[in-house]
Curated annotation (Swiss-Prot):
Pfam families: Ribosomal_L6
Role played: This protein binds to the 23S rRNA, and is important in its secondary structure. It is located near the subunit interface in the base of the L7/L12 stalk, and near the tRNA binding site of the peptidyltransferase center.
Family stated for the protein in its record: Belongs to the universal ribosomal protein uL6 family.
NCBIfam families to which the protein is assigned, alphabetical: L6_bact
InterPro entries per the UniProt record, alphabetical: Ribosomal_uL6-like (IPR000702), Ribosomal_uL6-like_a/b-dom_sf (IPR036789), Ribosomal_uL6_a/b-dom (IPR020040), Ribosomal_uL6_bac-type (IPR019906), Ribosomal_uL6_CS (IPR002358)
Gene, per the UniProt record: rplF
Protein name in the entry: Large ribosomal subunit protein uL6
Source organism per UniProt: Streptomyces avermitilis (strain ATCC 31267 / DSM 46492 / JCM 5070 / NBRC 14893 / NCIMB 12804 / NRRL 8165 / MA-4680)
Length: 179
């Protein structure tokens, strides 16, 4: 069995999990999420609020889907209870971020400012002009929005200017040798 897939998922108090055919819906204090499980994988509610994910056989595809399905459901439960946060930093002279309602406005050295609108279920928090965070209950959506913001101005390996994740180490390159 998949080492990840065979682990049972404990459902904390205050979280309601509904299984309707292949669709799993999770409701918690922060909101609700739903996901459709891939065809051969089965999910069942056990006693004491435990979810078990099983697969019919040991085919390679089923092994991969087993661990994936279990992790996606576990991430949904974590999302509706705690939520997910991706923190980002901006470094560079004149680079900054401003909160404009629920949107972010970036000054990243271009001739124009860039506005990023918050998708449904995502909120932005600006802690300082060079530090902000992306928050939400859907782990995939939080990571995707953070990656798209980072893509606006990737960190430069020569001067380390740009948008980077908090704690991300930028490998610096040596510039061209002068005479």
């Amino acid at each position: 069995m998949s080492r990840i897939g065979k682990l049972p998922i404990t459902v904390p108090a205050g979280v309601d999990v509904t299984i309707d055919g292949r669709t799993v819906q999770v409701k918690g204090p922060k909101g609700s999420l739903s996901h459709t499980i891939a065809a051969p994988i089965e999910i069942a509610k056990g006693e004491d609020g435990v979810l078990n994910v099983t697969r019919p056989n040991d085919e390679r595809q089923n092994k991969a889907l087993h661990g994936l399905s279990r992790t996606l459901v576990a991430n949904m439960i974590t999302g509706v209870t705690q939520g997910y946060v991706k923190k980002l930093e901006i470094s560079g002279v004149g680079y900054r971020v401003l909160a404009k309602g629920s949107n972010l406005e970036f000054s990243l050295g271009y001739s124009h400012s860039i506005t990023v609108e918050a998708p449904e279920g995502i909120t932005f928090k600006v802690e300082a002009p060079t530090r902000f965070s992306v928050e939400g209950i859907d782990k995939q959506k939080v990571g995707e929005v953070a990656a798209n913001i980072r893509k606006l101005r990737k960190p430069d390996p020569y001067k380390a200017k740009g948008v980077k994740y908090e704690g991300e180490v930028i490998r610096r390159k040596v510039g061209k040798a002068g005479k």
